[in-house]
Amino acid sequence: MTKETYVSATAVVSGSFLSGSMMSLSALVIPLFLDTIDDGPQLLRQWARLYHYGSIYMPALCVATCGIYGYVALSKRAAISPLWSPYVLAAVSTLAMVPFTWWVMVPTNNTLFGLHRSAESTELGVVQVLVVKWAWLHVVRSLYPLFGAFLGFRALIRELRT
């Protein structure tokens, strides 16, 4: 196996880890919050902290994963290999979660942050509905790096067969 094969595998693992980490927030953490928090402002505080830590780690991992896919694609293209384009598609698919966030998720995020900043007490039911909506949108966002990992894995398998 070549160095690029190891780097390709690293990109696939990184994208899979990113998707799994993101998915675990919607599949595990949000249900835990909903089951154990019975106060609207407290649920908003917990969601805001979850968002804070996620916004520190997840974008960095997304950029790193795209960078690794990009490195592999450029290496393949320089070597005149036809396997460069699947890695570009994997990078683009992984990065596509960013415009999805801007165009689809920001209104819900802004509403949750607005409620969090307000001094008045917020009804638990209102917050729960918004947090559940956010969780489902986050599931969809988590699929972008998963699809990128799938594309990268397919390219890696093709690479190993040649």
From Swiss-Prot:
CC annotations in GO: membrane
Cellular localisation: Membrane
Pfam families the record matches: Anthrone_oxy (PF08592)
Pathway: Secondary metabolite biosynthesis
EC number: 1.10.3.-
Reactions accelerated catalytically: emodin anthrone + O2 = emodin + H2O + H(+)
Transmembrane regions listed in the UniProt entry: 17-37, 54-74, 86-106, 130-150
Keywords, in A-Z order: Glycoprotein, Membrane, Monooxygenase, Oxidoreductase, Transmembrane, Transmembrane helix
Membrane protein topology class: Multi-pass membrane protein
Glycosylation sites: 109
Keyword Cell membrane: no
Chief site of localization: membrane
GO MF annotations in UniProt: monooxygenase activity
Described function: Anthrone oxygenase; part of the gene cluster that mediates the biosynthesis of the tetrahydroxanthone dimer neosartorin, which exhibits antibacterial activity. The two different monomeric units appear to be synthesized by the same set of enzymes, among which the Baeyer-Villiger monooxygenase nsrF is the key enzyme for the divergence of the biosynthetic routes. The pathway begins with the synthesis of atrochrysone thioester by the polyketide synthase nsrB. The atrochrysone carboxyl ACP thioesterase nsrC then breaks the thioester bond and releases the atrochrysone carboxylic acid from AacuL.
Stated family: Belongs to the anthrone oxygenase family.
Name of the protein: Anthrone oxygenase nsrD
Organism from which the protein derives: Aspergillus novofumigatus (strain IBT 16806)
